[in-house]
């Protein structure tokens, strides 16, 4: 890994059973950005839906040749992180949303407000099909931005109506499809997607193939669909969400995976590196705080390592992870 003349903070991943402690470098300061890397993953938000602490909700960037070309999710706080990272909306080839929980999409209006002033070409955005009480992504955008009836009618320009906002090119990914679907095909940049189980919430995992390397975002999921490990097979970087501890039980198990399952999915996929993110703490009224990953994050990460033999990176906001 190349040495940079900027501050580096070290995130620790414990290799259980070998006695080895692996230190993996990761920048995590307001000045840190990935613009000097030829290819990198940047964590904008490493938290989940619970407020408190210093973590924004979920969002990630893929940097290529000094530009942020793909953004995955846009949870609360990531509008600020996007600016701190030095990213520019005009550089994005795709903004991909995994599912329609607020901690993954609530900052989308903020990102698009006044976007027409910095970008003229359409912006491709992708999100899941509907199911149950959840609308499809295109209907969701209409409820937000329709010039006549939307929550933010001033952003009607995003839908080709009167108002402001860069025009969106919307891709709806069928979360119930049996096979992966293409989302974007560009020069040395391919994006595909597949549905993953997240209770009754249509949820999408994304695979980005860029310059011969692959980055997979697992989204929120229970880990109950074996097709995911096939979809993520051989990933250079696999991003998995770790909201729960191994002790978790009850209704939360319908939405998220325990650490052992997260590790097993990564092991079955033969991922070269595993990035753990979307850490959660218990809401104030919960009587079982130990069910959530931030109660004892080091121990929760160690539980993942019991079923995954490769290197693990514990995510932090604004962390830059070069992909050689």
Label each residue range with its predicted role:
Residues 2-14:
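Bacterial N-terminal signal peptides that target proteins for export
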Residues 8, 51, 99-102, 253, ...:
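Short N-terminal micro-motifs specific to bacterial/archaeal maturation
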Residues 13-23:
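Bacterial N-terminal signal peptides
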Residues 24-28, 52, 226:
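Residue-level recognition of conserved structural "scaffold" positions that shape functional pockets
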Residues 4-7, 21-29:
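N-terminal twin-arginine translocation
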Residues 205, 214, 221-319:
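Cap/insert and terminal regions of metallo-dependent hydrolase folds
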Residues 2, 30-215, 301-323:
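Binuclear metal-dependent hydrolase catalytic cores
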């Amino acid at each position: 890994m190349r040495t940079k003349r900027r501050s580096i903070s070290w995130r620790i991943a414990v290799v259980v059973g070998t006695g080895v402690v692996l230190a993996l470098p990761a920048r995590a300061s307001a000045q840190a950005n990935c613009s000097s890397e030829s290819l990198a993953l940047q964590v904008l938000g490493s938290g989940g839906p619970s407020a408190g602490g210093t973590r924004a909700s979920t969002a990630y960037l893929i940097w290529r040749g000094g530009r942020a070309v793909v953004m995955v999710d846009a949870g609360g706080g990531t509008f600020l992180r996007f600016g701190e990272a030095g990213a520019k909306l005009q550089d994005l080839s795709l903004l991909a949303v995994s599912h329609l929980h607020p901690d993954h999409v609530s900052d989308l209006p903020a990102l698009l407000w006044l976007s027409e002033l910095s970008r003229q070409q359409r912006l491709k955005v992708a999100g899941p099909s509907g199911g149950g009480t959840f609308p499809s992504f295109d209907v969701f955008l209409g409820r937000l931005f329709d010039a006549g009836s939307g929550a933010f009618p001033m952003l009607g320009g995003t839908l080709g109506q009167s108002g402001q906002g860069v025009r969106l090119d919307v891709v709806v990914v069928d979360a119930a499809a049996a096979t992966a679907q293409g989302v974007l095909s560009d020069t040395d940049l391919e994006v595909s997607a597949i549905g993953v189980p997240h209770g009754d919430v249509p949820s999408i995992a994304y695979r980005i193939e860029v310059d011969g390397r692959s980055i997979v975002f697992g989204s929120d999921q229970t880990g109950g669909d074996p097709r995911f490990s096939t979809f993520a097979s051989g990933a250079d970087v696999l991003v998995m969400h770790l909201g729960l501890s191994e002790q978790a039980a009850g209704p939360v198990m319908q939405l998220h995976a325990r650490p052992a399952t997260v590790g097993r999915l990564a092991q079955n996929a033969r991922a070269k590196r595993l990035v753990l993110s979307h850490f959660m703490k218990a809401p104030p009224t919960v009587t079982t705080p130990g069910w959530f990953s931030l109660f004892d994050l080091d121990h929760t990460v160690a539980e993942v390592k019991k079923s995954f033999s490769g290197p693990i990176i514990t995510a932090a906001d604004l962390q830059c992870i070069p992909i050689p």
